């Protein structure tokens, strides 16, 4: 029973953090005076489920503003999970909440790694002023390298499911 409760709690904790993450992107874009087009669901590389915010107007803002928008989801998550964890440590002392904090902390770090269309990837291509929508053959070497590494990660993940 406790294990089922832990999974249910982790699901709600994860759902809350996904919502807050995407809201961070939306609100930072709004602060700059731009709007998002939609919130959607997709399968990165046809395997990894992802919720995203379509932000076409991001191409109309400065490099620094783009970086802020791309990092805003991670920053709001970081602040949220640390606030919840401080409350937990001071008052609740809940082990499931401790585990959820650790799990999501790793997820935040993973999102900083510039692969699989992550926020870290978006920040990196912005720093290098790379237009990811350009013709694939004209893509910057860094984009091709990231795409190759991402593809290797996808292949390794799928293989690990069956081995």
Predicted regions and their residues:
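Hydrophobic transmembrane alpha-helices and their immediate loop junctions
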Residues: 1-163
